[in-house]
C-alpha cells in the first residue's frame, strides 16, 4: 500500500535498462499458466465444454487422404497445446514483445513515472482504465467481443485493470518495462488456444478477456 516512489525507485532510465532478472522469466511463463487455467475454468462455466474434436478445422474437400491424416495428427489437442505454447513463448519474447513494447512504454513507463507518488493499487487501476479505454474504438468495431461490442468496452477495461496489477508488479520488481512487454506479447501469442479448445459460451465468458480469464487473473493477483 506504500507509494510507488518509496517502494521502488523507477526513473525512466531504470525502466528502460536491459538487465535480465528472474522476474523476466516469471513474466514469460505466467501467461501460459494463465491461459491454461483460463481454459480449465472456462470449461466449468454453464454451456461451455472442453473441445477435443478439431475435425471441423480440416478442409476435407480441399485435401487428400494423406494430408487429412497428417492434419488430423496436428489437430490433436495435446499436439496443438504443446506446439502453440512453444511457438507462443518464442514469439512472446521476440516479435510480439517488440510490438507490445510500444504500448508498454506508454502505460508502464511514462504513466508509471507520472504516478510515482501514488499507491500501487491506485496506479494499477488508473493505468488499467486508461489502457482499457484506449481500446474502445477497436472494441466497438467488433475486436475481442464481436457478439457484445458495447459491453465489451467495459469488459476490456476490467481486463486491462486486472492485467495492470500483474504487469506493474513486474515493472517495479525488475525496475524495467521489458517484463511487461514480454508478458503482454506472450499472452497475446497463446490466448488463441482458448478459441480452439472451448466449445460453447460467448465472448463475455470465454478466454483471458472474458469472465473465465478474470477469475484466473484475480487469483494470480491475490
Label each PLM-derived region with a short phrase.
Residues 1-29, 41-61, 99, 222:
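Membrane-helix interface linkers and caps
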Residues 25-48, 168-184:
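Hydrophobic alpha-helical membrane-insertion segments
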Residues 67-96, 207-215:
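Hydrophobic alpha-helical transmembrane segments
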Residues 101-128, 172-176:
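Membrane-interface helix/loop boundary segments of multi-pass membrane proteins
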Amino acid at each position: 500500500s506504500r507509494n510507488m516512489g518509496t517502494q521502488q525507485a523507477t526513473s525512466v532510465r531504470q525502466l528502460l535498462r536491459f538487465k535480465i532478472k528472474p522476474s523476466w522469466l516469471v513474466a514469460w511463463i505466467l501467461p501460459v499458466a494463465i491461459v491454461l487455467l483460463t481454459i480449465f475454468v472456462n470449461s466449468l462455466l454453464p454451456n461451455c465444454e472442453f473441445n477435443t474434436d478439431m475435425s471441423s478445422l480440416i478442409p476435407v474437400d480441399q485435401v487428400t487422404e494423406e494430408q487429412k491424416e497428417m492434419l488430423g495428427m496436428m489437430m490433436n489437442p495435446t499436439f496443438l497445446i504443446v506446439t502453440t505454447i512453444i511457438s507462443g513463448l518464442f514469439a512472446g519474447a521476440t516479435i510480439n514483445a517488440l510490438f507490445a513494447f510500444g504500448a508498454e512504454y506508454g502505460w508502464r513507463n511514462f504513466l508509471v513515472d507520472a504516478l510515482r507518488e501514488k499507491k500501487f493499487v491506485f496506479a494499477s487501476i488508473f493505468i488499467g482504465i486508461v489502457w482499457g479505454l484506449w481500446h474502445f474504438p477497436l472494441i466497438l468495431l467488433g475486436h475481442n467481443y464481436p457478439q457484445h461490442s458495447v459491453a465489451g468496452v467495459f469488459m476490456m477495461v476490467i481486463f486491462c485493470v486486472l492485467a495492470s496489477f500483474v504487469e506493474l508488479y513486474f515493472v517495479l520488481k525488475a525496475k524495467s518495462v521489458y517484463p511487461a512487454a514480454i508478458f503482454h506479447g506472450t499472452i497475446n501469442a497463446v490466448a488463441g488456444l482458448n478459441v480452439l479448445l472451448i466449445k460453447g459460451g460467448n465472448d463475455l465468458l470465454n478466454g483471458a478477456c472474458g469472465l473465465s480469464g478474470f477469475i484466473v487473473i484475480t487469483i494470480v493477483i491475490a
